[in-house]
């Protein structure tokens, strides 16, 4: 006998065909508002729609100059396809309105910056004011760049596009999803075979008999076809959560299909560990415009469970709620390595757009690898490689414009300077001119404590070498050298492709000249001659955080607080075992930065947790690379409003750090929880992995990992659900012991198990102590840390203190 997929019961689901299809899908859009950047070009308000705009001309299309990737203006027809919710440029270029992240007025993209001095592209004021760009596709930051015939035309196009995109993002996401699938059919109604194809495309398959029953159930006029409303109802049926019915009926007090207010109060208290008042319950019922205000239906209850108000992470963590009056060293700081690279370390594209992306994601420490430019103006690129080059001044302008969009807290520039003295002076002039009062006065010599986070709002802190920087000698080891010869980054040249290892040397081995420091640019494991580069006083006087070689935690405690250590990832692993307490104590007043080993040519990442576990504030990751280390980093810095600074837990701060040992099997006394129990219930609308075979339906499974200190490491997996990515159901429970819940993270990833291996679908990472107990929704994220529309996981979380 045929049954519904995963034995789910779809009986008693309200499928009233009288309601409008729009009302069936009322979860808020997961998309962020489009960013409009026009403030420095003109004072025209594009957000106020010009009532004289004729949208018909945009539907028909208008001729415009599009700048190609080679900087050549080409005449193209620009069309707003409102039926398909996309913008069309020429015959091939199509972008969904909902995928557009930003509209920029002027010459503000890599295309414009790269070609604005060419013969094809004018750089006069009028040309700039006639130009605009569309940025889309998430972190890939693809662009379409245009020049209009005049300023009024540009204003009309940008204003119209802004409103169309905003409307597309604000219209209910689920309704958009159903409408999009329906529009792809191009018919007024669909038959059984078409329905089967659509559902397969949506990752749902079942037997023909079950699908016939589903279609019959939704076919209100029994004509063996489904119109849009009937199709909407069928998808609503498949998206429902019948597995929540036993929980619902547990609190109905004998009221059949309704749970009274007292039952709601009991549900929130017992299942969700929340205290709700009668008035709050009534407000919740009112939200769904129900005719009764004394009880809630299962449909509305289910809608709440799967909605924005029931996400797994505590709502207050989406704001800056932590104490920001502590010294800078008390915070974990969201940090980037080789920020300018969009890909491979040896041949990738260097782009200022990566700084925009990284800063908008909440990153507060970015890296600039600066070299002499052929025209006398410093450039940024990955030295001695085939990576492309960008102007240092352009990056500074980007940092000033974007550095404080997510929060007012300071931005740290990690400067890897390989320039001659004249171009160092040029660097200093650029920074003084562009940053101005954002550059704070360097700290006095005897500083024992760094300034508070609050006192450094809107400041740009320069990290780099001074004439007193410790000089390193080059060892004769190769890239695979022993642990005793680990690079400690005395000269902090982690930005260059350098497989040479460094040993610390005594100050006496430094050059007698106090105005030089040493850099090695070797790309092999052989001994290289040290190159000495003089430091310009004009540059040196701007340095706020002075790079300094690390010897030991105890030694660090004796030097001024403005001196910062950079440690290669292997060194950190060594310190976790050899002197964890000393490093934790040193991190009370000093910043410690961890960076990837030089052999990570593919821009892969290291696990940031070992560094965090001993107090290292900055884990400099290749943020252009999506992998578990970056997901863990995103989970950490989704806390405290995503401002880029997260207060270190008590075990790493004065009062507890003196007795803290991350390698001890003893449970931390201040750990809030001793156990976490996770029931993985079900998922909805899991997308196909991009490399999946065309037409196949995914077979999803869930992996749960606790990531923390040495003893907080455990991985569990659910069973595989065959041929169902639309509404898979697991109902599996897992238990995780916790030794230090302050630092522990829960990483959940969903994968497709197929014949060729594991295919990633989505993930979600969250700090354990930020998880709300009870039945909660986790939104799944893609490789770019963007929420996947409509894809979510329903879990129940239980904590034992």
Swiss-Prot record:
The modification Phosphoserine is found at residue 524. GO terms for cellular component: membrane. Residues 471-485, 510-523 have a biased composition (Low complexity). Coiled coil: none annotated. InterPro entries: C2_dom (IPR000008), C2_domain_sf (IPR035892), EF-hand-dom_pair (IPR011992), EF_Hand_1_Ca_BS (IPR018247), EF_hand_dom (IPR002048), PH-like_dom_sf (IPR011993), PI-PLC_fam (IPR001192), PLC-like_Pdiesterase_TIM-brl (IPR017946). Ca(2+) binds at residues 490, 492, 494, 501. It comes from the Eukaryota. It catalyses: a 1,2-diacyl-sn-glycero-3-phospho-(1D-myo-inositol-4,5-bisphosphate) + H2O = 1D-myo-inositol 1,4,5-trisphosphate + a 1,2-diacyl-sn-glycerol + H(+). Residues 489-506 have a biased composition (Acidic residues). The modification Phosphothreonine is found at residue 531. SUPFAM superfamilies: C2 domain (Calcium/lipid-binding domain, CaLB) (SSF49562), EF-hand (SSF47473), PH domain-like (SSF50729), PLC-like phosphodiesterases (SSF51695). GO terms for biological process: establishment of protein localization; inositol trisphosphate biosynthetic process; lipid catabolic process; negative regulation of asexual reproduction; negative regulation of chemotaxis; phagocytosis; phosphatidylinositol-mediated signaling; release of sequestered calcium ion into cytosol. Substrate binds at residues 463, 566, 593. The active site is at 337, 382. Residues 542-652 form the PI-PLC Y-box domain. Residues 471-523 are annotated as: Disordered. Residues 206-241 form the EF-hand domain. Residues 656-781 form the C2 domain. It is an enzyme of class 3 (hydrolase). Its EC number is 3.1.4.11. Pfam families: C2, PI-PLC-X, PI-PLC-Y. PANTHER family: 1-PHOSPHATIDYLINOSITOL 4,5-BISPHOSPHATE PHOSPHODIESTERASE BETA-4, PHOSPHOINOSITIDE-SPECIFIC PHOSPHOLIPASE C FAMILY PROTEIN. This is 1-phosphatidylinositol 4,5-bisphosphate phosphodiesterase. The gene is plc.
